Each structure stands twice: as C-alpha cells, then as structure tokens.
Amino acid sequence: MTLDRPGEGATMLKTFTVLLFCIRMSLGMTSIVMDPQPELWIESNYPQAPWENITLWCRSPSRISSKFLLLKDKTQMTWIRPSHKTFQVSFLIGALTESNAGLYRCCYWKETGWSKPSKVLELEAPGQLPKPIFWIQAETPALPGCNVNILCHGWLQDLVFMLFKEGYAEPVDYQVPTGTMAIFSIDNLTPEDEGVYICRTHIQMLPTLWSEPSNPLKLVVAGLYPKPTLTAHPGPIMAPGESLNLRCQGPIYGMTFALMRVEDLEKSFYHKKTIKNEANFFFQSLKIQDTGHYLCFYYDASYRGSLLSDVLKIWVTDTFPKTWLLARPSAVVQMGQNVSLRCRGPVDGVGLALYKKGEDKPLQFLDATSIDDNTSFFLNNVTYSDTGIYSCHYLLTWKTSIRMPSHNTVELMVVDKPPKPSLSAWPSTVFKLGKAITLQCRVSHPVLEFSLEWEERETFQKFSVNGDFIISNVDGKGTGTYSCSYRVETHPNIWSHRSEPLKLMGPAGYLTWNYVLNEAIRLSLIMQLVALLLVVLWIRWKCRRLRIREAWLLGTAQGVTMLFIVTALLCCGLCNGVLIEETEIVMPTPKPELWAETNFPLAPWKNLTLWCRSPSGSTKEFVLLKDGTGWIATRPASEQVRAAFPLGALTQSHTGSYHCHSWEEMAVSEPSEALELVGTDILPKPVISASPTIRGQELQLRCKGWLAGMGFALYKEGEQEPVQQLGAVGREAFFTIQRMEDKDEGNYSCRTHTEKRPFKWSEPSEPLELVIKEMYPKPFFKTWASPVVTPGARVTFNCSTPHQHMSFILYKDGSEIASSDRSWASPGASAAHFLIISVGIGDGGNYSCRYYDFSIWSEPSDPVELVVTEFYPKPTLLAQPGPVVFPGKSVILRCQGTFQGMRFALLQEGAHVPLQFRSVSGNSADFLLHTVGAEDSGNYSCIYYETTMSNRGSYLSMPLMIWVTDTFPKPWLFAEPSSVVPMGQNVTLWCRGPVHGVGYILHKEGEATSMQLWGSTSNDGAFPITNISGTSMGRYSCCYHPDWTSSIKIQPSNTLELLVTGLLPKPSLLAQPGPMVAPGENMTLQCQGELPDSTFVLLKEGAQEPLEQQRPSGYRADFWMPAVRGEDSGIYSCVYYLDSTPFAASNHSDSLEIWVTDKPPKPSLSAWPSTMFKLGKDITLQCRGPLPGVEFVLEHDGEEAPQQFSEDGDFVINNVEGKGIGNYSCSYRLQAYPDIWSEPSDPLELVGAAGPVAQECTVGNIVRSSLIVVVVVALGVVLAIEWKKWPRLRTRGSETDGRDQTIALEECNQEGEPGTPANSPSSTSQRISVELPVPI
C-alpha cells in the first residue's frame, strides 16, 4: 500500500499512537491466533560496564525447540543447534564495538519452519543502553473510566524503568521489576491522562547511565466526540493494482483523522490533519495484503478523541468469490406455492441480483443495506413460467476489473406433480443367458424414494432409494415394459409423472415384424406342403373310407392356401427388389493395438513389456492371450485406455504368438494383430499390408513393427537389396510407390531393426502380393448428414455407382466391416446404404467403400472422415483481425485447442462437410478465408481430433459469426429495466448488435465525451447508470468501436430517450369502454395530468420503451387502440413531462390491467393416477388453465348442476356404487369477472375396473389381420362355389353312368385285397374303370 506524502495525504507516524479501544470486542470478532514471538534480552557479568561482555539470550515463549537463529540487520548472523531441545539459548557477543552495533532479532524452529522474529534489540555505541520498546494494553472498553496498562520492555535484567509524560520534568511513575519488562497501570482513565508518553531505563548501580528514550506513544481517550463515517470510493471491492480512496468524515472541522487496519494495528496506522471535517486516505496501487477491516476516528490538539467509526471491510481480489443459492422449501414446488431463493456470499456490503437463464435482465435486486441473514428473493404464487435455472450475482455499482466467476445455480421446477424421470437399462435391454439387468431410474434433484412399475402386471411394484432395480429373467418372466416414478421429501404423498416406457426383451434379441412375418409365411408354406403330401397318401391308401367329394374338397383347400402363400412370397420378393437396400452396420468393438517396449535398446529381450491400447473410451478390461490359450487380464492403466503386460527377461517359455482383446461392457473386441516372439535374440517379424492396387495411382505399403524407434526396410521378391529403407521412425512405417505400373507387381515383405543395433534385422514379414487388376471406376461415397457427429447420433453412408446390380463393401481404416448384396435398383443406377444406428466413441475413423461384380472390383472411393465429438474439451475460435471483413479481403480463423499434435477441422453452419482440415504439431491451427465475399458470411465453428485413435474429437467451439460487408450492421440500444426510470434508481443501457467481439461507444446528445465499453466478447455492451438524476436524462445512441484498423463504415444505433420520473404529480389512467374488451374491438386509454402544455407517455409493463407519446392541447391525452388483440392484454401506466423541462417526468399513474378476450381459453383436464378406477382407490382430476386468479368448476355428463368447485383445480372422484364412471369436463372463470366463463375442456372418460382394456393396434397388426381375413374369405368363396357345383355333378353322373361309378367305388374298396386274380372279371373291370375319366 502506498500513501501520499504529508503535504498530499496521509503519512504513517514513526511514533506509536495507541487507542484505548477493545477493538475485537467491539467488533464482535474472534481474536486472530498469532504465532508467539520469541523474547530477546541482554545479560552481562560486568554490572559497572555491561558493554565489556555481552550475551544475548533468546527464549521460546510456548514450546521447546531444536534450533535458534540470531539475525543482525535482517541478515543471518549465527544459529545454534543445542544438544537437546530447550526453551532458551545464549549467543555470546563479547565486548560491544562499532562492528557489533546494529539491530538484533532472533527466531526459533518449529514444525512448519522458522517462527516470527522477536522484537528488535538495538545495540548502539558503547556507553549507552539500547532504547526500550513501549506499547499499551487496553483491558476494558475504550471509554473514560477504563483501566490501561503501559508496558515498557528493556534488554537487561534488574533495570530501573521510568515513565515520562510530555510537559512534565519529573517521571510520573517508576518501577524496578525482576525481569526485563515493567507494567505501568493507569486506573480510572480520565481526559487528563491524555498525552504523549515515553519510557527510559538505567542500571541500578549506574543511575547516570540512561538508555535512549523509547518511541513516543500518544494516549487518546475515546468517546468525547461523535463517531465519524468511513466510506470507500469507488467501492469496497477492488482488484490488485487499482486505486482506492478511504474517506473518513466527522462533524467537526480542523481535527486530526486516523485510519487503522484491525489485522495489523502497528504497521497500518495513518494520521492526517485537515482544515475540513474529512480526510482522504489514498491507496495508489492496492495489494492483496491490503484486504482487511478498517476503522477511523479523529481527535483534537489535546488528544481528546471520537468514538470509532463502523467497520469497513475492504476486499482486494482479482476474482470474486462464488455466491451460493438455496431454494426453500425445495427446488421442486407445486403450482401456486411460494418459494424463497436465499443468496449468500462471503463479500459484505455489496448488493445481489437474481438472474434466470435465458433472460438478460435481473429478476430481482437486493440492496447492500438491506441484506442480512434473513433476506431472500421471493417468488410468490409460482406458475409454470417460473420453471428454470436461477443464479445469483454480485451487483456492483462501480467499475472494476475483477473477474466474475461461475455461480452456483438452482434449477426450479414448478409442477402439478414432479416431472418424469429417465429410465435406462444396464448393460442393455436384452436379457443374456443367466444374466440380470439393472434398471436405473434417474432424476437431477434429491429424491425420497423411487418406484418401478411393470405394465404387464398391475400388482407389481418395487421401491428403491438409489433408483437401481435388478430384474432377472427366470423362466422368461422378466421381459416386458417397465416405467418408474419418484417422490420428493417435501411432498411425500405426491408421486411424479411416469418415465417413458422401457421394454426388456428375451435372449432371442431384437425381432422385427418383417422378420416374424417372413418366417411365419415360410413355416406355413412348409406345413402346407407336408399336409398336401399326407392328404395324397391318405387318399391313396384309405380311399375305401372316403368319398371322392370330400377328398377333392380337402385337396382344393390345400391348393388354394398354397396359392395365396406363394403369391405373398412373390409380392414380398418383388417389394424387396424394388426398394434400395439398406444394411445396418453391426459395429464390432474396435480392434486394439499391441506393441512392445523395453528399457534396454541394445538387448530388448532382457526386459520386455507388451502394451495393449484400445481406441474406444469405454474399455473396462484388457486380455492378453498367448497361442490362443493362456491369458492374463488387467484393467486400463490410465485415461489413455491402455494396459501394460510386463514379461521381464525373454526366455524360451515366452516364445509364441500373442494377441490382445479389449473388454467393453458385455462385448469382446476383435483380436489385435499377432505379435510373434520367436527367440531371445531375434526380433519379432513385422506385419505388412497395403491399400488396393490401382493402375497409375499412388500406393502405400504399411509395415508395422513391435518396438518404438525402429528402422524399416522394404524388399521385393527376386531382388537382393531393399527397395526402400527408412530410419528410426517409430513402430510403423509407410513405403510409397508413386505410380503403380505392371513392373511394380510382385511379392513384397519388410524387415525391422532397432535404432541401437542397425545391423540386427528381424525375421521378414509374411509376403504380400501386389497384382494390378482391371477395375471399375470408384463409387460416389458420402454421408447423408455431416460427418462430424455426437455420440448416439444416427449415421447413414451412401455408396452409389452408375453400374447396375453391384455388391458393395464398406471399409473402416482399411478393414472390411460390412457388405451389401446386389442392389436391384432402377435401371441406370445402383446404391447401398450402410447405417450406424447409434454412434459410439470408437466408431470414428476413415470410411470408404468399393463395389464389385463377380471378379471385377472397383477402385476405392474417396475416404470420409467420421469424427465423433464430445471427447476432448472444446476449443476457441477467433478471427484476425476481426469478425467483420471488407469484401475482397482475407481473414484468418484461429482454432485454439488444448492438446498438441491434433488435426483441426473448420465448419460452417449449413455446410454438409467441413470446409478445411489442418494437421499441426502445436495446439492451434490457422484457417485462411481468402478474398471473402457475401456468401462467406455466416457462423463458423471448429473442432480438433486425434487421427490415431478412432478420430475422437472435441466439443464444437462456440460459433463465431463472420460478417462480409462494407458497413457494420446497425446496433440496437435499449434500457433495462425501462427507459422511464424513477429518480435515484439504477438503469443499464444496453448496446446490442449481431457482431461478437467488438467494443461499443455510448453517445449522449449534447455531450462531447462518450462512455466506452472495450473488448466486449458477448452480444451486447452494458453501460450502467447508478443513482440516476436529472443530469442523466436525455437522448442516447451507440455504435460499434472495433479495436482494429478497418475501412468498414460504422452507423449509429437508434435514439433512446431516457426519462426520469418522480419530479411531477402523478396522472390518472382510465380505459374506455372498460378494462376488458373482446378481440377486434376498439379501446381508448385516457391519461389525465395535473399541468397544461405537457407531453404524455403511455407505458406497458414488460416493455423496455414507451408505447406512444402525445402532445395534447389540454390536460388529457387519449391513446386510441384500434382492433385490439390478445397480445394487447397487460398492465399499463402513463407519465407526463412539461415542454420546458423535457425528460423530467411525473410519477407513474396507478397501474391499469387490460384484458383482451371474449372468452378465456379452455383448460386441460387430466386424471391421476389413471382414468381407471381401482378397488378402494379414488381418482384426482386435475384442471389446469393458463390464467391466474381463477375458480374452476367440474361438470359430469348426465348431471344438470356442476358437481364441484375448486380454486386449485384438483377434484377428488370416488366410485361409490359406480357413480364415478362417465365423461367429465371442466371450465373456469376469472375472479375479477365472475360472469365470464371459459370454454369447457376436452371431455375425459373415467372407467371402472372391468372397463375396456386398450389393445395395441399398430400398422403391422392391421396388415396381418387384413391378410388373414382376405385369405379366409377367398378360401371360403372358392369352397362355396365348388360345393354348389357338386349336386349337378352327382345328378349328371347318375343319369349317364351311375353303374360305372358304383363299380369304380366297389373296385376301389377291393383294391389291394389278396386272392383276386389279375385276369379276373374284377380286375378287368378295375382296369376299365381307371381308364375312364370321371366327368367334372
């Protein structure tokens, strides 16, 4: 803290001014526990000449210590470590000389370090004792009549202490204590005891050898004058480095003012004498240690002082401490209740403001003078509109650079009953064999109890405190639809709305209706074929018992049924052929990566560790397998989702092939690539792979080793030397063939070596054959939506080609993950759609597709980078030089991330794919928009992601609006809460525009200076005007103020007139024909003033600007409102001001509420817990309307008079003798207008326990039912037609050949009977009957 010089301000006295105030007692504060100081004194064995041999003693006041330190002139002189812990030690000085003279202090060692130093002992030239230390202790409150102790501390034993007072030649008191300190007591303090005191000492045996006098000490008796006031300007809370002025003001002129800080009275004590009745103590550059409680007082020339001022707490901080907000009685309240939001923070003397998320202006204010332990923000008679997230902020009336931190928030929910929770299943909604499912019911606020319901069983109900319910599937009884609800502690009798239903399925997995229908048709066809075969055999062997008519009818029925089934199968096949094929991608768990590390580069096999890393962020466990048998399991070692498997020294027992898997929830990933350890001195052979070979294009071959920092070589079969060779590049290397030709075909392999042993090569990899084949052109590949997606999103890949009837393959990072059969599309095109229903963190990567027809393949498509966001923190996006760019100029968008070595992408709102990509080694990337035009205007954002692990990306940055224009858009100026402000209140003028990151300037008409808000990073700039007065009213405008050089034109905002009210008598406001009118009618609001020649202003509650102004010739203004609408409803008032003093307005008129309605809107009616009566249970009907202050009525069909009235809209219905069943409706009326009733609600039907049960009626059920009906009807028609034909057939057969038919039946009965000769008449007749056809 710096203070001005005495001529300019306050100066700190070198004397100690002591006030007899029990400061901490008067403040009600707890004394600060300070570390006790050690005591330092002198001893000498030469009483006549003590400076001949001096020893300094240092004593710890409260504990023993192992080390003591002696300081001289603030530098270390010597330190002593005694042989055992002790309270005191001695430092031998010897004879006092010029070199020994100086300031001495001592310290002792404690657990936390060195203690505070002792009081200063000054050794001066020989022949004079060091001056004592002098201070005062107050034992009682600082008022006349209290007792005071004056303490004088010397440096030798058995000294004589003398107390002197200014103006007296003789000492007023003396003492000879046994120690080194004397205590002088002044009892019953009076004003005569005021004055300046000093203390001196001398040795008893040398009475003429006096010490130097102590520092003078002023004794001021308080309470003779009234207490002053202490204020801080600009405010009591400031940032380090800012200036502060503490003003102490009293009622008497010409006094001396004193300022002190309670925490350090000796070092923070300042005096200032002025000719006025106030003194300013100026802090030029505040420091953190200036924080504390400050007091001031004043005294006259006779040291008669005033009472202490009130305590003023000064905060010096660069960041405000957080406020906390608490809702009482609960954050979940019912409609119509009152809620208090209690906001508290550690900073005193500052106002508080209550904000609601989504609203710019504060809802309520608490002035600093009105805040105490019982003060809160109140929300009375809450409605649905009060639901939201609230926060509390400090309300500063002065300007400071202190940063505002994030604040504690409270989410207030206003419900007729608590909102529904969320219900999820872990690990999935499908039962696995022998496994249970945990249903998790969750809500964001404290809950008393959760309840789980099972829709298939009405009596089923489980309760849980933590919301977890374990469901087993014993005998298949766990499947079904579940929902949950909860109740809170403040309303234990009210259960919340039910959650969305969640269906649990059996181990068979997910079944679609198409699959069920196809399988049912196939099974029916097989059954029909078997049945037809049995009928034929039955007729063949058992026809003796069956008449021909019955057999024929049965066969006909079977044939017709088969005909319908075959037709249905053909229709399904044709439909499937016409539709474009869409294949759901069952994403495998990402394949992990396996490699080896060692800390012995020259002999890596001496200590080898295998590492397994998964690209997924949800890996629970890793498994390492050797030769597919033995395994070791371990958990991830860090957030990088990798695990170590130490093998130690490699021996023969370690040789083999290693794989690793990652375990996620209930799924195991594919195995990693094999790592084969073949010996103790042989490196494992690497793995070689390549992308598809295309003639004339670049080809990359990937060689993957197993250790870090390896060198690589590429070999081609038939050549002795390596084709390409790379130095130590890592665990993998890429060899490039610039242009693939016929000469490049052949078998390739690669080898590796360690960096320290470049001549020790590994085994060669397995050979890879490169063959150039004739190929179709590459397909067109894209995503239907943006390739930058959030977890859980739905992604569809579209792979298309002009060729027809092709099969498609989808690749991820070069590996095949899905395929599609030939697509029977319309002529001229063929396509396949690959679908990821819910994207996970591990699904990111580079996707591509190919198509093929028999042995001919296409070239790979261009890759699509799928980036899954929300894994890393979001970056920041800035525009350089600024977000407003002149057409034809360039702008740089810098995306600043958190991690280094990432890949950045720039996105524009409305664009399907990212605009630009950048891979950088640092943590930021610059995107250049060159020669921008109007089409480049829009919102931009950016992300960063890692390319080595499934393209896991960050959150999207905050959008940045780029304007390409030659003129800044016009900002908008408005006042909050209104441009009509009462005298003495606060108002904020907001300059808001669409351009972000630009400062604003506020202009007032008639003034040359402007108020500026620099560096605004939000949409708006705030210009607060506190304690508004007549000088604040007038016309205002604002404009942008960019902090970069630009030729873009700047245009001013609208003009805002700021009116100050409370300077004239209030007017009256009336409505003609009345305060309630029907929509479309006309209304006139009449504002009657007290003075002529006035301008009248009409105001509406919630509007920030006046609705209309009029300058009538008389005392009244008529505001005509033609064809009013519903939005004209509200609370109106008016003011007026004189032409001679514009903007100095009257008080507000009394408020007038206007209703524009012919009939209030109809309410809603619902039933709780359901619309079905259960045994012994009542139903509560809840009628809710949009307007407050109403009375509800419930009506029951069949009853002439209304059944019940209610103010809260709840009606309890019982079902005694079945009288509660039926249709209900409700309506309401306004209490202010009891003759106007609303429209009735939609009817609601209550049914009994045996009432109709709702059946699921889906499109699939309708289709299947219709198909069955058609088949049965058609079969019935065919059978009826055939039955009608049979009598004619029978008659015709009897008339023509009845005898032959009888013979045929008899011979059919004798068929196969033994003993019948082949050439007998019977057999002959039989052969004849078989050859004759039966007429039909």
From Swiss-Prot:
Glycosylation (residues): 53, 338, 374, 381, 607, 747, 798, 846, 939, 986, 1027, 1082, 1147, 1223
Effect the entry attributes to changing residue 765 to N: In CHTE; impairs IGSF1 trafficking to the plasma membrane
Outcome after substituting residue 858 to F: In CHTE; impairs IGSF1 trafficking to the plasma membrane
Gene Ontology cellular-component terms listed: extracellular region; membrane
Transmembrane domains' residue ranges: 519-539, 560-580
One of the GO BP terms on file: regulation of DNA-templated transcription
Extracellular side: 29-518, 581-1336
Keywords tagged on the record: Congenital hypothyroidism, Disease variant, Disulfide bond, Glycoprotein, Immunoglobulin domain, Membrane, Receptor, Repeat, Secreted, Signal, Transmembrane, Transmembrane helix
Sequence segments annotated as region (Disordered): 1308-1336
Disulphide-bridged cysteine pairs: 58-106, 248-296, 343-392, 441-484, 703-750, 799-849, 895-942, 1087-1134, 1183-1226
UniProt superkingdom: Eukaryota
InterPro entries per the UniProt record, alphabetical: Ig-like_dom, Ig-like_dom_sf, Ig-like_fold, Ig-like_Receptors_ImmuneReg, Ig_sub, Ig_sub2
Domain Ig-like C2-type: residue ranges: 38-122, 137-222, 226-312, 321-408, 419-500, 589-677, 686-760, 777-869, 873-958, 965-1060, 1065-1150, 1161-1242
Cleaved signal peptide residues: 1-28
Coiled-coil intervals, chain numbering: none
Cytoplasmic side: 540-559
Compositional bias annotation for Polar residues: 1317-1328
Effect of residue 942 to R: In CHTE; impairs IGSF1 trafficking to the plasma membrane
Pfam families from the UniProt entry: Ig_2
Connected disease: Hypothyroidism, central, and testicular enlargement: A disorder characterized by insufficient thyroid gland stimulation by thyroid stimulating hormone (TSH), resulting from hypothalamic and/or pituitary dysfunction. CHTE patients have delayed testosterone increase at puberty with normal testosterone levels in adulthood, normal testicular volume in childhood and enlarged testicles in adulthood.
Annotated function: Seems to be a coreceptor in inhibin signaling, but seems not to be a high-affinity inhibin receptor. Antagonizes activin A signaling in the presence or absence of inhibin B. Necessary to mediate a specific antagonistic effect of inhibin B on activin-stimulated transcription.
Subunit structure: Interacts with INHA. In PubMed:12385827 does not interact with INHA; standard receptor binding assay. Interacts with ACVR1B; the interaction appears to be ligand-dependent as it is diminished by inhibin B and activin A. Interacts with ACVR2A, ACVR2B, ACVRL1 and BMPR1B. Interacts with HECTD1.
Protein name in UniProt: Immunoglobulin superfamily member 1
Biological source species: Homo sapiens
